[in-house]
Amino acid sequence: MRLQKAPLVTSGLVLGLLGLGNLLKDLSLTLNAVCGIFAFLIWIHLLCTMIKYFNNVKEQLNSPLVSSVFTTFFMSGFLGTTYLNTFFSNITFINSLITPIWILCLVGIMTHMIIFSIKYLKDFSLENVYPSWTVLFIGIAIAGLTAPVSGYFFIGQLTVIYGFVATCIVLPIVFKRLKAFPLQTSIKPNTSTICAPFSLVAATYVIAFPKANAFIVIIFLLLAQIFYFYIIIQLPKLLKEPFSPVFSAFTFPLVISATALKNSLPVLMFPDIWKGLLFIEVLLATVIVLRVFIGYLRFFLKKENQDKFLRNASQ
């Protein structure tokens, strides 16, 4: 059966799957590989769609919502290098591609951020602001999370510092927008991206800075968990809505929040009770990613629903 076109926001699911695989890596290398394979297959489908329907891609990118979410396409590339390093580092040719791919993703995400900023900040409108602006402007911090793969720890450290400052600037603007112009019901899942930036900074800090300061780790983790539970409280209501590709917004934020907790605990030496919280967060992230993944498979097989979303996305 022929699969329907993949909307650009599909990259959010790819990122979520890759992040989940790395989150589960210590538990099972097989699960890590399975997540990577599914992510790669969906990424290939997305890439083929982008090439074949390039004009439609340009139309979708005219939407500030879709364009801000598309940052996850480049973020997926960063995480993809960790899979190449894990499973193919012994193959000389593939190993030689890891750092160039990492650099290409860095250039890509910076270029996308600059183009978006020129387009939407020059004539700023609060109505063009979406929660996924946090991903757009802070997503580059994932360079620090993957710094061990490229070896560019200094760049990773700069992105962590930038990510924290940018989060402090962007989040208040996002909340102001949500108060002045509440999101339409159909795109409310995008709200879940609010918990991503501080979690990404927290998860990245202990990786990019080998000698992480415990006090800073506590501050970052506390902020990350506060926004995480802010979203978790809303999650049951958000999940009641009919499935839409915007559900991809649920995946990476929950995964990176669990990753932030996982990365921070060894540094903080907290009591074992915190491992119970980690288990719950990992389990929840796994369930949500699986649900969204299944939803996408069904979506790709239903042309009517797919065409409706693409029309809305290009508006």
Task: List where the protein language model places each region.
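Juxtamembrane helix-loop boundaries in multi-pass membrane proteins
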Residues: 1-21, 55-82, 102, 118-145, ...
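Membrane-embedded alpha-helices and immediately adjacent juxtamembrane helical segments
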Residues: 21, 29, 38-44, 175, ...
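Helix-coil boundary and interhelical linker segments in multi-pass alpha-helical membrane proteins
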Residues: 22-31, 84-97, 145-157, 205-216, ...
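Membrane helical hairpin/interfacial module
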Residues: 25-90, 99
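Structural signature of hydrophobic alpha-helical transmembrane segments
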Residues: 31-44, 94-110, 154-168, 214-226, ...
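Membrane-water interface of transmembrane alpha-helices
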Residues: 41-52, 108-116, 167-174, 229-233
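Hydrophobic, ordered structural segments
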Residues: 78-88, 95-119, 144, 156-163, ...
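Generic multipass alpha-helical transmembrane bundles of integral membrane proteins
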Residues: 104, 133-228, 233-234
